[in-house]
Regions:
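Phosphate-handling substructures
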Residues: 75-142
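Active-site-proximal alpha-helix that buttresses catalytic centers in soluble enzyme cores
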Residues: 2-84, 137-140
Length: 143
């Protein structure tokens, strides 16, 4: 029986000058540095025999993840074309979206953030909902 290997890649740095917890919010794209990170990751994956034979590329529908996945897809497809293989297409899947978070859209750092206000620390330390909104069971059920 042939083994299947799944590689998980986190998105590059996000342009977020207001330090908002963006979670599932639209409109949060890669920063210039994030694009360079995605391109460097793409080059690495395309150059490695262990990863450049990918059969599929999946991404959540979030802007930053699609941008990162697209950089990887472009590099892998260049390698595939050099081997006369069919190009891959990006598959987006809502089930692999980031975990839900009760602090979505708020500032959470720099001392004045939502984590430190109105007893919110109790939410942060709840081990049954480590993402402060969506439990491990909920995540497992959707994935």
């Amino acid at each position: 029986m042939q083994a299947t290997t799944i590689h998980f890649v986190r998105h590059g740095e996000v342009h977020n000058p207001d330090h908002i917890l963006y979670e599932r919010l639209p409109g949060f794209h890669l920063s210039d540095r994030g694009r360079r990170m995605a391109e460097a990751t793409a080059r690495y994956l395309a150059a490695s025999p262990q990863t450049n034979t990918a059969a599929a590329i999946y991404s959540s529908p979030l802007d930053r993840t699609r941008e990162t996945a697209q950089a990887i897809l472009t590099a892998l497809n260049e390698t595939r074309m050099a081997r006369n293989e069919e190009p891959l297409e990006l598959v987006t899947d809502q089930r692999i979206i980031e975990a839900g978070n009760n602090f979505r859209g708020t500032r959470i750092g720099h001392g004045e953030g939502a984590l430190w206000r109105n007893g919110n620390w109790k939410i942060v330390t709840n081990l049954w909902k480590p993402s402060w909104g969506e439990s491990y069971r909920q995540i497992a059920a959707r994935v």
